[in-house]
Amino acid sequence: MAEALAPSSSANLGPGFDSVALALEITCRVVAEPAAEWSVTHHGPHSPAPGDDDAVLRAARTAVGDDNPLALEVFNEIPRGRGLGSSAAAFVAGAAAASRAVLGESDPERVFRLAVDLEGHGDNVGAAVFGGLVAVVGNVVRPLQLHEELRVVVAVPSRRLPTQWARHARPEVIEHEAAARSVARAIALIEAFRSGDLQLFAAAAGDELHEAPRGALFPESDDLMFTARSAGALHACWSGAGPSILAVTGPSEADAVAAALVGALDDQVVVLMPEIATTGLR
């Protein structure tokens, strides 16, 4: 028997579209054991609906082949369809647990490449495998420095926003000026996470490439970001494709930001205060 655990993640973080992600200590754990035939059992409230694609099973079969059947058990804490990297964590944990059960080990680079192929983009996968704050370009992933005093608060609306809907909301053509502003904001964001600089976090706000178009689909997310900033957050952004939002705070502001978000959206929101997952796949 073998097991693997992967953290959730918040991707994009505003201007870092499909290239930056932060790992969070909300986890997906998979236990794998050789069996006569393939099976998967899910525990907890965040299980795929009957008929939905099972990311853990697909990753496990891809990692070790159909001829090495496993009985899989999944213990998932990550809300699905809320922009918290649930599919990336499932792919990573499923591939790693299967590899450990059949091959005796799981190479992080192999798991990363396999999960990127399944996921289609590498930001959430990079955070799930390597932890912390990461930058991802294609199959190249590198850790970024993270100021030790930063804290995060996550607001999860009760209503889902399927990732494919959010992706279709993006404009097909981006004006040169908007693209240039986005690059500048991304640079400011990365340095803000390293230094904790308040002015740089402020400069990184206001993404035009994906947050603004998606706001029309789910304006409640924009309301949550406004609430977080008004309560003292250094930075607030869509978490991945949403509708969850991530608020970045200092240590003394986290409780106030969380309290403000708890009362938002007529209480149709769950507020989490996870630790940043400095370690990824384990």
What is the predicted function of each stretch?
Residues I26, A36, G132, V156-L161, ...:
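Glycine-rich beta-alpha junction loops
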Residues L24-I26, L84-P108, V129-G131:
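DPxDG-like acidic metal-binding loop motif
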Residues F193-R282:
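Glycine-rich, charge-dense phosphate/pyrophosphate-binding loop(s)
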Residues V156-A216:
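Active-site rim beta-loop-alpha module in soluble metabolic enzymes
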Residues M1-R82, G104, P108, L272-R282:
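ATP-binding N-lobe of GHMP and related small-molecule kinases
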Residues A35-E37, G65-A71, A98-L114, V140, ...:
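Phosphate-handling active-site elements
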